[in-house]
């Protein structure tokens, strides 16, 4: 059953079910509880599952100010404290993985699982979109189209968001969490799709080097949602890891 709790004057939706040791599941940007429930449903026999809609997503209220990823982590910390969740296994997909990294860097956790979680900001290696824009600039008389191209090639996440959520998205993607990742001192499992364009496998390999006790599993022919595309296999992996 979905429950609403007020944290920092924001009504936040969450569900908690199952029994056993605690597992916390954190969804990605633009997603909600439903995106992590397939994992929770298959782990609930041996674990107490907690999943929330982050502020601004699902049925949780939108924040009135532009939060940072650290603000989101503080909200998670308050929620888990109220729910008496201690030393959980924390799992996050994409944006949720960013929050999991911060949480695990400064709280007691049993283990960490990250699914396609970009957390290392790179100045070099511009994205395909930026490369395309730069190539456009080389064509005479094309400069006027740059704004048009940026608008039409911009992130769907960004274009669909409210003004507050747009500012939050900018805050999130500009944050480099390398230093937080280095502080994670528990076994950490990275599960990635080899065709992930949002968080390329190269990023996962770097993350594996940064986190002291990390292991990487790359799933073939899989995208940013590799954990859902290979659910039976991922559940087997998780059961062995936990």
Where in the sequence are the language-model features?
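Flexible "cap/lid" loop of the alpha/beta hydrolase fold
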Residues: 98-140
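Short beta-strand/loop motif that positions the catalytic acidic residue
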Residues: 184, 190-192, 196
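Catalytic histidine-centered segment of alpha/beta-hydrolase-like enzymes
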Residues: 222-231
């Amino acid at each position: 059953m979905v429950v609403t709790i007020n944290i920092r004057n924001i009504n936040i939706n969450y569900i908690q079910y199952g029994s056993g040791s605690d597992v916390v599941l954190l969804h990605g940007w633009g997603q909600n509880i439903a995106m992590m429930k397939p994992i929770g449903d298959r782990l609930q026999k041996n674990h107490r599952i907690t999943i929330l809609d982050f502020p601004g997503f699902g049925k949780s209220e939108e924040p009135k100010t532009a939060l940072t990823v650290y603000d989101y982590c503080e909200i998670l910390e308050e929620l888990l404290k109220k729910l008496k969740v201690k030393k959980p296994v924390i799992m996050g997909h994409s944006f949720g993985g960013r929050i999991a990294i911060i949480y695990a860097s400064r709280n007691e956790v049993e283990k960490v699982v990250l699914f396609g979680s970009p957390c290392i900001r790179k100045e070099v290696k511009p994205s395909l979109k930026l490369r395309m824009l730069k190539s456009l600039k080389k064509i005479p008389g094309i400069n006027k189209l740059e704004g048009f191209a940026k608008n039409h090639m911009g992130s769907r996440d960004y274009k669909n968001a409210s003004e507050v959520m747009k500012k939050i998205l900018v805050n999130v993607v500009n944050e480099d969490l390398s230093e937080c990742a280095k502080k994670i001192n528990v076994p950490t499992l990275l599960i990635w799709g080899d065709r992930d364009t949002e968080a390329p496998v190269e990023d996962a390999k770097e993350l594996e080097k940064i986190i002291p006790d990390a292991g990487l599993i790359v799933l073939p022919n899989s995208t940013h949602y590799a954990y859902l595309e290979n659910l039976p296999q991922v559940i087997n992996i998780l059961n062995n890891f936990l």
